[in-house]
Amino acid sequence: MGAIFTNIAEIFAKSGWAQIFFTEGGWKYAVMLAVACVLLYLAIVKQFEPLLLLPIGFGMLMTNLPLDGIFHMDIFINETNHINWELLGSSGGMVDYIYLGVKLGIYPPLIFLGIGTMTDFEPLIARPSSLLLGAAAQLGIFFTFVGAKILGFTNQEAGAIGIIGGADGPTAIYVTTKLAPHLLGSIAVAAYCYMALVPVIQPPIMKALTTEKERQVVMTAPRRVSKTEKILFPIIVTIIVALTLPDAAILVGCLMMGNLMKESGVVERITKTAGNELMNIITIFLGFSVGCTTNAATFLNIQTVEIIVLGIIAFGVGTAGGVILGKVMCVVTHGKINPLIGSAGVSAVPMAARVSQKVGQEYNPRNYLLMHAMGPNVAGVIGSAVAAGILINRFG
């Protein structure tokens, strides 16, 4: 009988339970498991960005179960900052190989390809001034870069943190893997959480910066855009961006390729594949592998708190930047632009545009801002990719 109890004790001593409850740093595992459960709750019950928060949350859950060894960070984050292919071959598991798509910058451009097949640039083409609102909303990126530098982050880390202000998860992941891969988990979680909280974060800022009269402005219907314009737009944008800022070419190019596939109407089968099956598969791989990087050792520190605070500042300043420029355009056009559409310049598509619509209808039930707000919204997608290219060009 004694031998049986001895064996049971030895099994327990080598279990994850013992690591959590009877080791000095075991509490960190418990905290991370709690955080993972919160993310899963937000995804499942509150339905906040469930397509990404669910796989990220479950990846976080898996990687913080002691002794499972599901992900080996030292393969990717080391003194050389290059992949240790020898260690990958000898010790790598499934998640390590899936994470190669993140580390090598494969998944975010493919996500952009899928987004392109679902994006309608007609509101932007019909009203090119929307591009200015999309650009103004990127103010949060560069404002937060300065704030991160003041807190002692390096240029690379500050650039990766600042990109949260673009409200574009794939772009944030892409920039972080290029500039500060050791911060990937914290930045990805912050970026997607704030994207999910757009309806909570934006309205108070929008109302604080606009008057009731401005919120009631009714905009005239935009002009009709021809099929030729829709086909030429992605081609022209790709050429201009790639020649001006090569580091943004892959993100913008994939976005525009997806859109050209959609607008041309000649490759319907692969358009559906890119926007559905391919994008769904990549989303699973991206979310789960990023979640697996959020282990207790790299996530539970003061830097994560600073990133969360800086992230919400970035988002708030970006929203304010778009609204303020919207107010300027309202004055310049003698009241033809509703400043509320400026908040849609962040690239949370189409959620930010829906927020503009909702706030506008609170003050004028007959006001329909959704299509007008989609112009700055899709401009924000391009703007965040261009901002990413600038940061990578300067600090990569």
Predicted features along the sequence, with ranges:
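Alpha-helical membrane segments and immediately flanking helix-loop junctions
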Residues: 104, 112-118, 133-143, 147, ...
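Entry/N-cap segments of selected transmembrane alpha helices
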Residues: 124-145, 295-322, 373-377
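Hydrophobic transmembrane alpha-helices of secondary-active transporters
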Residues: 39, 99-125, 258-261, 279-301
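Juxtamembrane and boundary regions of transmembrane helices in multi-pass small-molecule transporters
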Residues: 146-155, 187-215, 321-334, 379-396
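Alpha-helical transmembrane segments
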Residues: 182-200, 310-318, 341-344
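Membrane-embedded hairpin module used as a gating/binding unit in multi-pass transport
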Residues: 193-266
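N-terminal alpha-helical transmembrane segments of multi-pass membrane transport
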Residues: 1-77, 90
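Transmembrane helical segments that form the transport core of multi-pass membrane transport proteins
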Residues: 238-322
